[in-house]
């Protein structure tokens, strides 16, 4: 049995340089680094994310918690209280995710900017990527609807039957039944995502409302209600995911409750809702926030073929 890491010394040194550059970038901008708990009593209600369950003892009594899938919930409690820009670099966990771009445990950079619009945050992201890449970087902006144009379909106007026909025409034989967003996710991941950001880093904007999660909603240029969020793609890899942050506790609770109803229909575990976050939500200042995969950023910068080379020891070898 080999004890050696999956990452070479040179790759580890490159990773260390990226982490140093990120911290220096935020120090220069006056953004405060914070640390929040990895273990939480509440879980992620998102139906596409599996939380890692943790069993422990609290004051001598057995308890069940979850390793966080993102520091978002706890960071927003700090944001609501302190009302200052904050960032965090930490390990996060998502169960049942393993592949060339996935590891169950990975490193996330997350930051929140009070009184920043999504455009402001996109510009700061561009500056950070330029620093990490050590060269000026420009972004291309592409709407979610326009990303489907090469397939000859419109995600908001066309029917599920049109989506199904498109999938079959491209030899994708999976049945998402009557799940409209499921069909769109299938087509996007198989036929659109692999080519995004191949020539220039691409911001995909105006996602369907069904993908809003913790983002606000607005009407796009065609009048469709969409999520105020964007994702950054480089070389066909999703690098970052940003929201114009929802600051409405009642709406957030309704979304979490709806998620759990979907989880029940799908036979997934019902997740405890983070009531601390709900209580803090109304006090969050107008802001935008973003999560960035550090391991994936290292992959695209150093042209690594697998996330294995961006992480010293992967979960299956830990």
Model regions and ranges:
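Polybasic, low-complexity association/targeting segments
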Residues: 1-2, 6, 18-22, 224-250
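Metal-assisted phosphate- and nucleotidyl-transfer catalytic regions
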Residues: 131-235, 258-284
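Short amphipathic C-terminal alpha-helix that caps PH/PH-like domains
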Residues: 122-132
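Active-site pocket scaffolds in enzymes
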Residues: 250-318
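Class II aminoacyl-tRNA synthetase-like tRNA-binding/catalytic domains
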Residues: 1-120, 172-177, 193
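Hydrophobic, well-ordered secondary-structure elements that form the walls
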Residues: 204, 242, 293
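Short, glycine-/Ser/Thr-/acidic-enriched flexible segments
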Residues: 72-74, 92-94, 113-116, 209-211, ...
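Active-site-proximal helix-loop elements at catalytic-domain edges
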Residues: 45-48, 231-268
């Amino acid at each position: 049995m080999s004890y050696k890491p999956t990452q070479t010394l040179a790759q580890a040194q490159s990773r260390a340089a990226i982490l140093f550059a990120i911290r220096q970038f935020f120090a220069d901008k006056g953004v405060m680094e914070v640390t929040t708990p990895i273990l939480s009593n509440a879980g992620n209600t998102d139906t596409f994310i599996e939380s890692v369950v943790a069993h422990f003892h609290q004051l001598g009594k057995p308890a069940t918690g979850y390793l966080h899938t993102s520091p978002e919930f706890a960071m927003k409690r700090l944001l609501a209280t302190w009302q200052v820009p904050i960032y965090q670099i930490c390990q996060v966990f998502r169960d049942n995710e393993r592949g060339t771009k996935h590891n169950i445990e990975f490193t996330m950079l997350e930051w929140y900017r009070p009184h920043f619009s999504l455009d402001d945050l996109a510009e700061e992201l561009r500056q950070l990527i330029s620093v990490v890449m050590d060269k000026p970087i420009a972004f291309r902006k592409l709407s979610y609807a326009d990303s489907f144009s090469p397939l000859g379909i419109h995600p908001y106007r066309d029917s599920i039957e049109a989506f199904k026909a498109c999938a079959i025409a491209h030899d994708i034989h999976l049945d998402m039944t009557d799940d409209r967003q499921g069909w769109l996710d299938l087509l996007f991941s198989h036929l659109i995502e692999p080519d995004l950001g191949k020539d220039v880093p691409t911001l995909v904007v105006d996602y369907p409302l069904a993908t809003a999660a913790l983002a606000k909603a607005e009407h796009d240029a065609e009048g469709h209600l969409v999520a105020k969020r964007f994702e950054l793609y480089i070389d066909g890899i999703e690098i970052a995911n940003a929201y114009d942050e929802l600051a409405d506790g009642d709406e957030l609770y309704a979304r979490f409750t709806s998620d759990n109803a979907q989880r029940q229909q799908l036979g997934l575990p019902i997740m405890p809702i983070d009531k601390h976050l709900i209580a803090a939500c109304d006090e969050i200042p107008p802001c935008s926030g973003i999560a960035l995969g550090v391991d994936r950023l290292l992959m695209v910068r150093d042209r690594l073929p697998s996330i294995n080379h961006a992480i010293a020891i992967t979960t299956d070898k830990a």
